[in-house]
Amino acid sequence: KLGDYIKTVNESAGNDYEIELSVDETDQPTTLAEHYIIADQCLKGGMKLVSLAPRFIGDFEKGIDFIGDLDALHASLKDHAAVADVLGPYKLSLHSGSDKVSMYGLLANATQGRFHVKTAGTSYLEALRVVARHDPSAFREIIDFSRGRYETDKATYHVSATLADAPLTSEADDATL
């Protein structure tokens, strides 16, 4: 129904639109059967699917490189790309893609260039670096607020970092921040 709504609203307004479907925020990798069923049903329903972000094998923590077996990942990427070719073609999307340098070439190869990498985290970190350099007190406020929210907010992400991994702002000089 959401796909129908998006289509109706955009077409009636004369707007072009596209859908990127994300199913990557799960504990288990997306199976090929799940990928097929999800994409097939969306496409049969008239959804303008441009890319799909499955949950791939391995670990995709925010801000660090891929953790896992690269050969197994490459084989899995090829399999998911084959599903996308049969049903679409549409792009495979890598969410939590920031800093996954070891797998970018594998993704490009497996998809023959039909891929999307979501790197919003890197842009956010670069923005924080600018704040730290130009307004250290504002950066300290952001860090203190973030530390206060970390235990709650990390529940929605796959991360292994702990608060003990980072110094308190009161213990760090501006250059360290």
Predicted regions and their residues:
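Active-site capping/gating regions of soluble enzymes
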Residues: 1-14, 27-177
